[in-house]
Amino acid sequence: IMKKLTLLTLMCCLCLSLWAQKTVTVTSPDGKVEMRLNIHADKLTYDLYHAGNAVLTDNALGMQINGQEITAHPKMTGQRSKHIQETICPVVPLKFSAIENNCNETTVNFKNQFSLVLRAYNDGVAYRFVTRLKEQVEVDYETIGLNIPNDCMLHVQETENFWTSYEEPYVHVKSGEWKEGVMSTLPLLIDAKSCKLLVSEADLRDYPCAFFAHASTGLKAAFPPMPTRFEPWYDRRLK
């Protein structure tokens, strides 16, 4: 009986470990860039690979909406993938009059009325949260982690608060020496020796810009909190 009980216990533990994590992978059209979404029992993380080599691993990814952390205890309900090959012509062309958009995209659906769209390009990756909530959405916070070694060189535009005109000069500092209490605007450049990582964002509408600050494992995102009220400040501003 003890042998059967022990065997049953081991089988149960094995089943729990198998269900504890699922990984969804999206790869660039040339097969060199890879983003892996790790669906744990209680959280989401992501890994980045280039040419088979790990660039960033076990990076935190999450979001809290309307007081609920939708990425806690994530339950995947399905996924779909597609290849995107199109030419984008900006209404107001700046550097290019035509931009080639070539990537592989995977949309991962979750039980808490949200999806995560992952894209892998030949020169980078991108992601986006998409909700299926009918009511008005208020984002409490978004979690983005960048786990980098302490000897990476950072090229950052430093600021001590969220009120910035984005005119500060860029400074160059090692990640392990970047002091706490200081943030960086985007874009920021990380020299990871094996490759260089440019972190940026796009398509912001009614959403605050991200900043990045020092964390115990590298860098973490910080966002301006939603103001509870506005009042005039000087002759042409609100605060």
Language-model regions: role of each:
Residues 18-20:
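Boundary at the C-terminal end of the N-terminal hydrophobic targeting segment
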Residues 5-14:
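Sec-dependent N-terminal signal peptides
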Residues 4-5, 23:
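N-terminal cationic leader/targeting segments used for protein routing and processing
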Residues 25-239:
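N-terminal accessory beta-strand-rich subdomains and adjacent acidic, glycine-rich linkers
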